From Swiss-Prot:
Residues 127-145, 198-223, 296-311, 400-419, 472-580, 639-672 are extracellular. One of its GO terms (biological process) is sodium-independent organic anion transport. This is Solute carrier organic anion transporter family member 4C1. It catalyses: estrone 3-sulfate(out) = estrone 3-sulfate(in); L-thyroxine(out) = L-thyroxine(in); 3,3',5-triiodo-L-thyronine(out) = 3,3',5-triiodo-L-thyronine(in); chenodeoxycholate(out) = chenodeoxycholate(in).
Amino acid sequence: MKSAKGIENLAFVPSSPDILRRLSASPSQIEVSALSSDPQRENSQPQELQKPQEPQKSPEPSLPSAPPNVSEEKLRSLSLSEFEEGSYGWRNFHPQCLQRCNTPGGFLLHYCLLAVTQGIVVNGLVNISISTVEKRYEMKSSLTGLISSSYDISFCLLSLFVSFFGERGHKPRWLAFAAFMIGLGALVFSLPQFFSGEYKLGSLFEDTCVTTRNSTSCTSSTSSLSNYLYVFILGQLLLGAGGTPLYTLGTAFLDDSVPTHKSSLYIGTGYAMSILGPAIGYVLGGQLLTIYIDVAMGESTDVTEDDPRWLGAWWIGFLLSWIFAWSLIIPFSCFPKHLPGTAEIQAGKTSQAHQSNSNADVKFGKSIKDFPAALKNLMKNAVFMCLVLSTSSEALITTGFATFLPKFIENQFGLTSSFAATLGGAVLIPGAALGQILGGFLVSKFRMTCKNTMKFALFTSGVALTLSFVFMYAKCENEPFAGVSESYNGTGELGNLIAPCNANCNCSRSYYYPVCGDGVQYFSPCFAGCSNPVAHRKPKVYYNCSCIERKTEITSTAETFGFEAKAGKCETHCAKLPIFLCIFFIVIIFTFMAGTPITVSILRCVNHRQRSLALGIQFMVLRLLGTIPGPIIFGFTIDSTCILWDINDCGIKGACWIYDNIKMAHMLVAISVTCKVITMFFNGFAIFLYKPPPSATDVSFHKENAVVTNVLAEQDLNKIVKEG
């Protein structure tokens, strides 16, 4: 009788908790457990039945050498020694009232609080403060882009080492370290506000048509304020060092502490909270930007939010995050190395690791010498690498849209930047959180196997791919823009903002303040030829505009003036916004529904002792191929659709003011479809390559035959014990 089909799996090695469970069982139970969980034992047992006089050497000497009647105290001490389960507290302080926290739910609560804090700072406050920091410290956009990338660079450099060494360490204390670093990074990021001095206002910008204007000096000199760039980068590097253990060791600790069918629900909840953080960060940051940057001078200055010189108090949110993050250090450090019941939970788990020819030594990974071999082992796991590449492709598109969706909404549907950002956040954040929770819930509800979770992720990606073509439907024609798509009623030229009607106004392209008159949008009141504003009216209204032909009366003033222009963009005639938001919301849900299943699949398809390292590799590759290049690729793509650049009086090109809406929609569809196809390809290839461990049918077959072979098996086991 040959070994059963599918049993031979070198990667499928039982963990030490399973050994403890079998030591306390009766001989018959030992036989059934061995047949159902120990591949090498299963391969050797049929041969022993054929030749009982030749005892087989067991690959696990500790199993046969231990007597079957091990005491409960012995088992308990072995369990505590292996998993170091303990009570919640610090040193000798372990009050009973705090033991309610010493559960998976208690740890999940603290994990979620730290994930929310990290999301508030890194993906909320930093993103919303970048433009203010750029103006305050006189930096180029390329430099502020480097600030944004510093977090991912730090994460990439540290993720492998933290995940490898942290796997053998005290994971909750690693998360206490993460809370410390996140708080420190937030504090460092806010320091330039306290050392750069008081913000000095420049002169008011004249936005109307004047025949004489002071010339602008183009002598460039490097400002000392730009040196604070290095402080911001240091803050981001510290934040990256804090985020590394949070999303590698924290996820692995959650997976350790709960049964397999609940793991996806816990992980999905934790990831959903990390998405909730940016939502809070955007709301908090937006409110703080309505406060003047120098709080003490806020009431004494005449400048308002409508003034281009206005800068908000971007730094307050970082101080609040610093305090909150450091308040989590002590709670995390009070958790034991393993929560109570971890040994029992691990004993009941069945490995679903992908079968390969790699070494699966139980002691593998305990020494630093094993790091290169462990890294090589994971890189040779084709299923794992396919899943990592699929998440990287998905990360590229999600980070790109997270950065530029407000810009797309603003330009396609003619909205203000603040309202577009609000709508973008209202679609992205709830959709992503709902998708994460729903994906984790479905995997947990139906107790999907590793292969089924990959199939589920493939299905959700397919739905998201189909709905991604919403950008083709949502495209809107550009509204008439004088000098860009409209030629000043035939008196000017396309591509030139200057026309005979404003030639004597000495207008500057350094200040973009759009106005609308006669259904046409103008770059500024000056380019519309407006010489006078109407005071104390919201929105601001201009009259005596030489470039606007149709006369419009202003009834709110004592006199009647003609040739009116109103501040702001012209109202768009495109009514596709509600449909676009609804469909894109569904796209986001299905996109993020695959996140938790893929993470669970990665945890299941690798060796138990390499899960943290696997997550570290995933996050490193995800950032190298996804989150770092994603915004850059999206930025270059959107810039390629620009039809009106900001060129100041010194001839230096800045940001883009007007985009070709049709071309932008087509380009975003091309990126979305390409990334989704890559994601589905690697998901499908992972499903094709995956070789599961013994199926339930194989295990049931052995359990049914265990009764027949029980007597011979007990004799064989006793013989090995005597010889040992």
